[in-house]
Amino acid sequence: MKITILAVGKLKEKYWKQAIAEYQKRLGAYTKIEIIEVPDEKAPENMSDKEVEQVKEKEGQRLLAKIKPQSTVITLEIQGNMLTSEGLAKNLQQRMVQGQSDFTFVIGGSNGLHQDVLDRSNYALSFSKMTFPHQMMRVILLEQVYRAFKIMRGEAYHK
């Protein structure tokens, strides 16, 4: 099994990198894990709707270029499905039983995901109706994926 975290933007702060490295290490006991960053599009502060769409399209093209055809794509979206930790574990486990073994979780940039990326998605996942920095979402996502594996294996951790 392989899990890819595909994200717009680069981690700059050391503390985010350390948190990511810790969860990558922990997840290594359960799955192959890869994090792929695509460059975010430089954009002015007060963009028109058209400019926002252009930024999302360029970032979306970069994301789509990194998704393997056989990968099950799970996009992180505010309007996605909200699950408990146990629900995420069950969702992943059901997909694995169905023979899915390559998962790509996609985290968009500050303007969200382009429609082409949303159309490629097999499942839309939401952690909250709130907006979080994409750097923080990587850590939260990795922690929840790690927690899901612990739950699937019946190992202590998730309480």
Curated annotation (Swiss-Prot):
It is found in: Cytoplasm. The keyword S-adenosyl-L-methionine applies. CDD domains: RlmH-like (cd18081). The keyword Ribosomal protein does not apply. It catalyses: pseudouridine(1915) in 23S rRNA + S-adenosyl-L-methionine = N(3)-methylpseudouridine(1915) in 23S rRNA + S-adenosyl-L-homocysteine + H(+). S-adenosyl-L-methionine binds at residues 76, 108, 127-132. Coiled coil: none annotated. Its main location: cytoplasm. Transmembrane segments: none annotated. Its EC number is 2.1.1.177. Keywords: Cytoplasm, Methyltransferase, rRNA processing, S-adenosyl-L-methionine, Transferase. One of its GO terms (cellular component) is cytoplasm. Homodimer. Belongs to the RNA methyltransferase RlmH family. Specifically methylates the pseudouridine at position 1915 (m3Psi1915) in 23S rRNA. This is Ribosomal RNA large subunit methyltransferase H. It comes from Staphylococcus carnosus (strain TM300).
